[in-house]
């Protein structure tokens, strides 16, 4: 496996959403895909070194290059999630710098994640759920609290389980439900309803969810 390359840039290419360079490493040319942000800073005849993720399939070998081991490791975390292939991973790396991406995943910022090409809401939710702890840990951050943590018992509706069950029956998944309850508890639409007003909590959550999906 190739883990690191140092060489002279002999060719730069952009094809669609892919940004690629060809590195001359001791007489061997390696085609390496990088983010467009990095591609724009490079020139032909420039010597660079990159940490490499090597993707091997039955009919194709691909190299993805990164300036640091941290960037490469974040990329590897991303593509470990079902439905996130190398191109989607690169789109996420292009949309956000490393720290921004870690924070978006750790904080469940689905809107930011969905700005990356090819990342829909369901995929963003999987990223937030599956990587929240691991991506924060290896990037040197404390994991953010889960999306429902930090809501006091006084803020939660007394029939919170019923609210969650009703929203689940309406087709909302666990992450969406927890985000909605936390948003209402934190007063995103004004003071939270009384704890015993199940209908008001349900209406508030539904209104928040409808805006969030817009």
Swiss-Prot record:
Its main location: cytoplasm. InterPro entries: DNA_helicase_Holl-junc_RuvA_I (IPR013849), NA-bd_OB-fold (IPR012340), RuvA (IPR000085), RuvA_2-like (IPR010994), RuvA_C (IPR011114). Residues 68-146 are annotated as: Domain II. It comes from Synechococcus sp. (strain CC9605). GO terms for molecular function: ATP binding; four-way junction DNA binding; four-way junction helicase activity. The keyword DNA repair applies. Has three domains with a flexible linker between the domains II and III and assumes an 'L' shape. Domain III is highly mobile and contacts RuvB. This is Holliday junction branch migration complex subunit RuvA. Residues 155-214 are annotated as: Domain III. Residues 147-154 are annotated as: Flexible linker. Belongs to the RuvA family. The RuvA-RuvB-RuvC complex processes Holliday junction (HJ) DNA during genetic recombination and DNA repair, while the RuvA-RuvB complex plays an important role in the rescue of blocked DNA replication forks via replication fork reversal (RFR). RuvA specifically binds to HJ cruciform DNA, conferring on it an open structure. The RuvB hexamer acts as an ATP-dependent pump, pulling dsDNA into and through the RuvAB complex. HJ branch migration allows RuvC to scan DNA until it finds its consensus sequence, where it cleaves and resolves the cruciform DNA. Keywords: Cytoplasm, DNA damage, DNA recombination, DNA repair, DNA-binding. Homotetramer. Forms an RuvA(8)-RuvB(12)-Holliday junction (HJ) complex. HJ DNA is sandwiched between 2 RuvA tetramers; dsDNA enters through RuvA and exits via RuvB. An RuvB hexamer assembles on each DNA strand where it exits the tetramer. Each RuvB hexamer is contacted by two RuvA subunits (via domain III) on 2 adjacent RuvB subunits; this complex drives branch migration. In the full resolvosome a probable DNA-RuvA(4)-RuvB(12)-RuvC(2) complex forms which resolves the HJ. GO terms for biological process: DNA recombination; DNA repair. Residues 1-67 are annotated as: Domain I. It comes from the Bacteria. One of its GO terms (cellular component) is Holliday junction helicase complex.
């Amino acid at each position: 496996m190739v883990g690191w390359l140092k060489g002279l840039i002999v060719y730069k290419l952009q094809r669609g959403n892919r940004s690629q360079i060809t590195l001359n490493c001791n007489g061997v040319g390696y085609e390496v895909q990088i983010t467009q942000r990095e591609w724009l800073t490079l020139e032909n005849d420039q010597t660079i070194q990159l940490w490499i993720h090597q993707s091997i399939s039955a009919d194709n070998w691909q190299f993805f290059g990164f300036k640091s081991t941290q960037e490469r490791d974040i990329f590897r975390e991303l593509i470990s999630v079902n439905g996130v292939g190398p191109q989607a991973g690169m789109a996420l790396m292009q949309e956000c710098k490393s720290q921004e991406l870690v924070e978006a995943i750790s904080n469940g910022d689905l809107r930011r994640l969905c700005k990356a090409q090819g990342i829909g809401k369901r995929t963003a939710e999987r990223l937030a759920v599956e990587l929240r702890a691991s991506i924060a840990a290896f990037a040197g951050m404390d994991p953010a609290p889960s999306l429902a943590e930090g809501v006091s018992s006084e803020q939660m509706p007394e029939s919170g389980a019923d609210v969650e069950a009703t929203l689940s029956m309406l087709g909302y998944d666990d992450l969406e439900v927890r985000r909605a309850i936390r948003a209402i508890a934190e007063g995103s639409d004004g003071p939270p309803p009384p704890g015993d007003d199940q209908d008001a909590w349900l209406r508030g959550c539904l209104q928040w969810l409808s805006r969030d999906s817009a």
